[in-house]
Regions:
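Short coil turns linking two alpha-helices in DNA-binding domains
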Residues: 40-42
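Short Lys/Arg-enriched helix C-cap and helix-to-coil transition segments
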Residues: 57-73
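Short, amphipathic alpha-helical "recognition" segments used to contact nucleic acids or chromatin
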Residues: 13-29
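Short alpha-helical "recognition helix" segments of helix-turn-helix
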Residues: 31-37
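Short, Lys/Arg-enriched anionic-surface-contact patches
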Residues: 1-17
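Helix-turn-helix/homeodomain-like alpha-helical modules used for DNA recognition
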Residues: 72-125
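C-terminal flanking helix
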Residues: 53-54
């Protein structure tokens, strides 16, 4: 049995980080090392995010609200003026949006074929 929180921590949060890393490097002109330092991860982790070796289990790009959130998070991080708790809060809000709007359901079904995602409404609560 895979809990939604497990799925979020192992798939959604890395996917959000991957999108933020991509923005920091491509839009804000940061090096992998700079992005890693600001996000509190290693440079090899940033490389894996950029090469879709980490954070690729669930596709979140193209979802308007997620794109907006990752843009805001990248701006917050790159400004270096925002407290880490504010960044954490924004990431958590993005995770909540993803769960409540059922963007994790297909991945959950792939990982746990016995789950009936049509009758499941756990994440909407």
């Amino acid at each position: 049995m895979i809990l939604p929180e497990e799925l979020a921590s192992k798939s959604v949060i890395p996917a959000i980080r991957a999108l933020v890393v991509k923005r920091l490097v491509e839009e804000h002109g940061m090096t992998q090392q700079q992005a890693a330092k600001l996000l509190g991860v290693t440079q090899p982790a940033v490389s894996k995010y950029l090469h879709q070796k980490r954070g690729a289990a669930i596709r979140l790009n193209g979802i308007k609200e997620v794109d907006q959130a990752t843009g805001e998070i990248a701006n917050m991080v790159s400004s270096r003026k925002v407290k880490p708790l504010e960044v954490m809060s924004r990431i958590e809000a993005a995770c909540t949006y993803i769960k409540r709007n059922r963007y994790m359901c297909d991945l959950h079904k792939r990982l746990e074929p016995g789950i009936d995602i049509e009758s499941c409404h756990i994440c909407e609560q």
